[in-house]
Amino acid sequence: LPVLLRGLRDTVSDLAAVVTVADDGGSSGRLRQELGVAPPGDVRNCLVALAGRKRLAEVFDYRFEAGEELRDHAVGNIIIAALADMAGSFEEGVGQAARFLRIKGRVYPAATESLTLVVRYADGTTTRGESVVHKVGKQVSAVAVEPGGLPAPDAVISAIDRADIVALSPGSLFTSTIPSLLGGGVAEALARFDGPVVYVANVMTQAGETSGFSVSEHVRAISDHIGPVATDILVHSGDLSDDLLARYERENAAPTVVDREALERMGVRVREADLLSDDESRGVRHDPAKLAAEVRRLALVRL
């Protein structure tokens, strides 16, 4: 999501991001456990992506490298936790952080309190917690959140209702994308939305979580959880280098197969474009400008 936000921030006048609060690992997990605050890490990443005050954004992203208590904590996570505690509301704390950073857009947590991810695997077993999924390494079949039935914040529903286009960004399908859509009222808001709902397909599968998944299986997983909301699919069209493929093969990941006929049978339009960064040093990464340009193009075509 931050990659897409960085691409859109200077070209879209009214930008809103909805961010999962099911993270329970790393700095976010420690703050969640010790302070009872909703995990701020994913929210922080989106705030930083939209920040107008670049130096302050660098402070938010700074991580302590020493000290038993502060090691690996992101400064921004601590600030958001403090603001939420002072305001008595995680949602308001995020809003205050957004004003500090002078973000270009709005960032909304998908829920007003911490959620716990409940994961069901293809073999019928279940685990609780987002951070254990990749350690388990088994094929995921479905996820839910606890407590269940919580309504999404009113601001989230309002943002969907007012949108010209909704983009489901690339990322971990079962531990990031789908959990952000499970708040009460979100599925209904997307079902009545009459604009394009664009799913930006992951270029690579993830070991265990989506091993062997095609693009249509990603879309079907979203549909199984909230209904058939996607109208358009955006996929990368270029080839990957042999070195890059070998690097991901060692991680039990492979390119996501674009099964166009299956997608068209599901009633979704497929758009292929060059979406990746030319810099392969950090692996397969979407290019913010390329990705944003294609999302904007889809919005213009469909409006």
Q: Residue locations for each model-derived region?
A:
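C-terminal functional extensions of proteins
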Residues: 212-303
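A short, Lys/Arg-enriched amphipathic alpha-helix followed by its capping loop at the start of a domain
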Residues: 3-14
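Glycine-rich phosphate/diphosphate-binding loops and the adjacent beta-loop-alpha structural elements
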Residues: 61-89, 171-178, 204-210, 240, ...
